Swiss-Prot record:
Mg(2+) 2 binds at D191, E227, E231. This is Ketol-acid reductoisomerase (NADP(+)). Gene3D superfamilies: 6.10.240.10, NAD(P)-binding Rossmann-like Domain. Substrate binds at S252. It is an enzyme of class 1 (oxidoreductase). Its EC number is 1.1.1.86. Belongs to the ketol-acid reductoisomerase family. Pathway: Amino-acid biosynthesis; L-isoleucine biosynthesis; L-isoleucine from 2-oxobutanoate: step 2/4; Amino-acid biosynthesis; L-valine biosynthesis; L-valine from pyruvate: step 2/4. It catalyses: (2R)-2,3-dihydroxy-3-methylbutanoate + NADP(+) = (2S)-2-acetolactate + NADPH + H(+); (2R,3R)-2,3-dihydroxy-3-methylpentanoate + NADP(+) = (S)-2-ethyl-2-hydroxy-3-oxobutanoate + NADPH + H(+). The active site is at H108. SUPFAM superfamilies: 6-phosphogluconate dehydrogenase C-terminal domain-like, NAD(P)-binding Rossmann-fold domains.
Length: 332
């Protein structure tokens, strides 16, 4: 069973008197920096000067500096820019200021685990990874609650790295919910696997394939959309709220029997072999190297696949059907 840390295990005071630099002001950067500030900590946001995020952070009342200035000032530097940018930004704008005793933090272990960033041995390297999007991190903090998070320690030069990381987690509200201990290796490999096999890759390919099957069999695209994509949210919400057993309890017996008997034919031995193959590519670094090279080449494959999915018939019919759903317009 995982070790879980709570409020009683964290001492926010250990970060008082230290300056925290949040590098990036996207979903997580915005949520984490604002919550740390509201927790009474000294926070500066490191950004590219003149960019849209710079003005937004200033408008939100944050102290803003260039990445170099923030890194030079800070005792604790949290990297919250995209994975593919972190290595270059770290080496060019942060590494020169990583002096002994500083803390380097992440919310995803990709660059540390695969060696794109190799910090000196005299600094702490930690991870606090909230298990929710940034807007929910912020909303739960403001409501006096928090979202679960992961904590990992890669280097403990100070012998206080876990204390610093848990204090950071407390500063963004995560110790109110619980912080699970992991490693950079485990977080990185399981996160990538989930994205590729289930959450992003497997799910979208399953939806497209089932939609295509119905349309090619002569069913109306609109009906196929409802049955293969639209209703997916209903099922996922049930699993999210109560687990798979609760989901089965909520659907009809016909749906449960059909799903249990036929679902095992869809996810068959060949599918499981591909899951293992995908995991091996993550574990041995092949996927990481492929992604780095793809970015170096200007993302030709990434852009082609993105365009291909954008032009899929399910996108065309989906846009039309979503225009009939006023509750979606209200969210915008």
């Amino acid at each position: 069973m995982a070790t879980i840390y709570y409020e009683k295990d964290a001492d926010l005071k250990i970060l008082k008197g230290k300056k925290i630099a949040i590098i990036g002001y996207g979903s997580q950067g915005m949520a984490q920096s604002q919550s740390l500030k509201d927790s009474g900590l000294d926070v500066v946001v490191g950004l590219r000067k003149g960019g849209a995020s710079w003005e937004q952070a200033k408008k939100d009342g944050m102290k803003v500096a260039t990445i170099e200035e923030a890194a030079q000032q800070a005792d604790y530097i949290q990297m919250l820019i995209p994975d593919e940018l972190q290595g270059k930004v770290y080496h060019e704008q942060i590494e020169p200021y990583m002096k002994k005793g500083k803390i380097l933090g992440f919310s995803h272990g990709f660059n540390i685990h695969y060696g794109m960033i190799k910090p000196g041995k005299d600094i702490d390297v930690v991870m606090i990874a909230p298990k929710s999007p940034g807007h929910l991190v912020r909303r739960m903090y403001q409501q006096g609650a928090g979202v679960p998070a992961l904590v990992a320690i890669q280097q403990d030069a100070s012998k206080k790295a876990l204390q610093y990381a848990l204090a950071y987690a407390a500063g963004i509200g995560c110790t109110r919910a619980g912080v699970l201990a992991t490693t950079f290796k485990e977080e990185t490999e399981t996160d990538l696997f989930g994205e590729q096999v289930d959450l992003c890759g497997g799910c979208t390919e399953m939806v497209k394939a089932s939609f295509e099957t119905l349309v090619n069999a002569g069913y109306q695209p609109e009906i196929a959309y409802f049955e293969t994509l639209h209703e997916l949210k209903l099922i996922v919400d049930l699993m999210y709220e109560g687990g798979m057993a609760a989901m089965w309890d909520s659907v009809s017996d016909t749906a449960q029997y059909g799903g249990m008997t036929r679902g095992r034919r869809i996810i068959n031995e060949q599918s499981r072999m591909e899951m293992w193959r995908t995991l091996e590519e993550i574990q041995d670094g092949r996927f990481a190297r492929e992604w780095v090279l793809e970015n170096m080449a200007g993302r030709p494959h990434f852009n082609a696949l993105t365009q291909q999915d954008a032009e899929h018939p399910i996108e065309i019919v989906g846009k039309e059907l979503r225009s009939m759903m006023p509750w979606l317009k209200q969210k915008k």
